[in-house]
Design a protein with these regions (language model features):
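Active-site-proximal beta-strand/loop segments in catalytic clefts of secreted hydrolases
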Residues: 63-65, 108-112, 157-158, 185-189, ...
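Surface cap/lid and interfacial helix-loop subdomains adjacent to catalytic sites
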Residues: 134-148, 169-314, 319-340, 344, ...
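Hydrophobic membrane-insertion alpha-helices, especially the h-region
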Residues: 1-7
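Gly/Ala-rich beta-loop-alpha elbow adjacent to hydrolase catalytic centers
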Residues: 156-164
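Active-site catalytic motif of lipid deacylating hydrolases and related acyltransferases
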Residues: 9-25, 62-150, 306-377
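N-terminal module-boundary/linker segments of secreted carbohydrate-active enzymes
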Residues: 7-47
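Structural recognition of the beta-strand scaffold that forms the well-ordered cores
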Residues: 58-61, 105-108, 153, 182-185, ...
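Proline/glycine-enriched tight loop/beta-turn segments at coil->beta junctions
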Residues: 51-57
Length: 378
């Protein structure tokens, strides 16, 4: 019996996450109010002039999936246990990567459960649509508070990469593209054919300093064949034409050790560092572990060496292969590249410039002096 359970453990895991009710009759969680700070994992103090912030960009981070499913199609944002997990594990590994890059905006949203990415049911697509509506509303508020001289970075992980692709489609195919430093869409497939249809104004990045472009990869360790096949063949990609599987489509793969799309092998000496942080304060900076893996793009997948530290191994638990890792192997690579691309965008001169407010200068009082009449007879 135990042998059968182990053999069919993925099917068992999937069945356990089924909410057991149609999405149409499902009592949806209350929508977040993005005017309220409690609906954000990270948001800057909007009362402080962005000109005074030590960084130059604004970064919108769409967090990965932490909710497996079971009771709900979508995560209620008042689920204190999962929200705590987001704050304790997701934030230090995936959000605070960009602390030194820009002002951070990371909304809580009614993320679709992991189960919705394991089934082809229409209910799953509707749950993902609900999640995107939250992300879109949060991004609209982000834009209202983002000064026009500040570069923008979009960072989405796993489910967040799916929604990030749609943000690019809906907002960055016109003049806003000039403010885009880069979009990091990590852990969900981005087919190259999208750049001929939905993403014509935001092409793939080709170098480490390209701006207004997209970086994307799905990274897999040795032994990850099951989830690699799922990534490249079965996950659905949303475009204006609807949801279509990733199968038989060439996928964008950016090697984060080289910052290009080549199939060259990048040795571990190029790896700037990963972290496996937990419970850190937002201001804390974890110490990255460097030179952990080599990496190579092959067939649209980023194939990794086995990491030197066990901290980056997949947790051995039911459904562990499908869950977001409690670590970010490319934390330091992303941080440094984000800074590089922001500076590159500013150097293009395409963004408006802003001078320091006159309020910060000393005011010199001018005192009238008597005017002596000119005597023309002298």
């Amino acid at each position: 019996m135990l042998g059968l359970l182990y053999l069919y453990r993925d099917d068992v895991f999937q069945n356990l996450q089924d909410p057991g009710q149609p999405f149409q009759t499902y009592d949806k969680p209350v929508a977040p109010n993005y005017l309220d700070n409690t609906s954000w994992m990270a948001r800057p103090d909007l009362q402080i002039d962005p000109f005074l912030h030590p960084t130059l960009a604004d970064v919108f981070v769409i967090v990965p999936t932490v909710y497996k499913g079971g009771e709900h199609w979508n995560l209620p944002i008042d689920d204190t246990r999962r929200i705590e997990k987001l704050n304790q594990i997701t934030r230090p590994n995936y959000v605070d990567t960009f602390n030194d890059v820009g002002r951070l905006y990371a909304p809580y949203y009614r993320q679709a459960s992991l189960y919705t990415f394991m089934t082809s049911r229409e209910d799953a697509r509707r749950a993902q649509e609900l999640a995107y509506l939250d992300v879109k509303r949060a991004f609209e508020l982000f834009l209202e508070n983002s000064a026009p001289e500040r570069p923008i970075i979009i960072a989405g992980y796993d489910q967040g990469a799916l929604h990030g692709t749609r943000i690019l489609t809906d907002f960055f195919q016109s003049t806003l593209k000039d403010r885009l430093a880069v979009a990091y869409l990590i852990g969900h497939p981005v087919p190259l054919d999208l750049f001929e249809t939905d993403l014509t104004q935001t092409p793939p990045c080709e170098t480490s300093t390209d701006v207004g472009c997209v970086v994307s990869f799905g990274a897999f360790f040795p032994g990850d064949e099951v989830i690699a096949e799922r990534f490249s063949e079965r996950l659905l990609v949303k475009s204006r034409a609807g949801y279509k599987p990733s199968a038989h489509r060439e996928l964008l793969c950016t090697n984060p050790l080289l910052w290009n799309r080549s199939q060259d092998y990048a040795p571990s000496r190029l790896h700037k560092g990963g972290v496996a942080a937990q419970g850190l304060e937002p201001e804390a900076r974890p110490a990255p572990l460097t030179k952990q893996v080599g990496a190579q793009c092959e067939g649209g997948l980023l194939l990794l060496d086995k990491p030197k530290s066990k901290l980056f191994n997949r947790p051995f638990k039911l459904g562990g292969k499908f869950r977001t890792l409690p670590s970010n192997l490319f934390y330091e690579d992303l941080r440094l590249n984000g800074i590089e691309r922001v500076n590159a965008l500013i150097d293009t001169g395409r963004l408006p410039k802003r001078v320091k407010k006159l309020d910060d200068f000393k005011v010199i009082e001018l005192i009238d002096s008597p005017v002596s009449p000119i005597n023309k007879d002298e």
